[in-house]
């Protein structure tokens, strides 16, 4: 089981996302289930390394730890930079 530490995002929009990426982080979102969608931020290098592990894209899911609360999710969509090896956004769906 892969566990990723995430933080809740307070600022949203293009400028806030660009500031995150400049700080070696990137935006993501968790949706689905009965709870409301949560905008989060992830550390780029940690997530990029975990992405290479088997099981990151499996339907068995990942565990996101947000403010000490564990949420079981699976990857729904990944957006990448056009020519750099960078993740720009990930959509997670609750399972």
Curated annotation (Swiss-Prot):
rRNA-binding listed as a keyword: yes
Superkingdom of origin organism: Bacteria
A Pfam short name: Ribosomal_L25p
Single GO molecular function: structural constituent of ribosome
UniProt entry tagged with the keyword Ribosomal protein: yes
Annotated InterPro entries: Rbsml_bL25/Gln-tRNA_synth_N (IPR020056), Ribosomal_bL25/Gln-tRNA_synth (IPR011035), Ribosomal_bL25_short (IPR020055), Ribosomal_L25_dom (IPR029751), Ribosomal_uL5_bac-type (IPR020930)
Keywords: Ribonucleoprotein, Ribosomal protein, RNA-binding, rRNA-binding
Any GO CC annotation of this UniProt entry: cytosolic large ribosomal subunit
Annotated Gene3D superfamilies: Ribosomal Protein L25, Chain P
One of the GO biological process terms: translation
HAMAP family to which the protein is assigned, alphabetical: Ribosomal_bL25
Family that this chain belongs to: Belongs to the bacterial ribosomal protein bL25 family.
Subunit annotation: Part of the 50S ribosomal subunit; part of the 5S rRNA/L5/L18/L25 subcomplex. Contacts the 5S rRNA. Binds to the 5S rRNA independently of L5 and L18.
Function: This is one of the proteins that binds to the 5S RNA in the ribosome where it forms part of the central protuberance.
PANTHER family referenced in this protein's UniProt entry, alphabetically: RIBOSOMAL PROTEIN L25/GLN-TRNA SYNTHETASE, ANTI-CODON-BINDING DOMAIN-CONTAINING PROTEIN (PTHR33284), RIBOSOMAL PROTEIN L25_GLN-TRNA SYNTHETASE, ANTI-CODON-BINDING DOMAIN-CONTAINING PROTEIN (PTHR33284:SF1)
NCBIfam families listed in its UniProt record: PRK05943.1
Protein name: Large ribosomal subunit protein bL25
Originating species: Yersinia enterocolitica serotype O:8 / biotype 1B (strain NCTC 13174 / 8081)
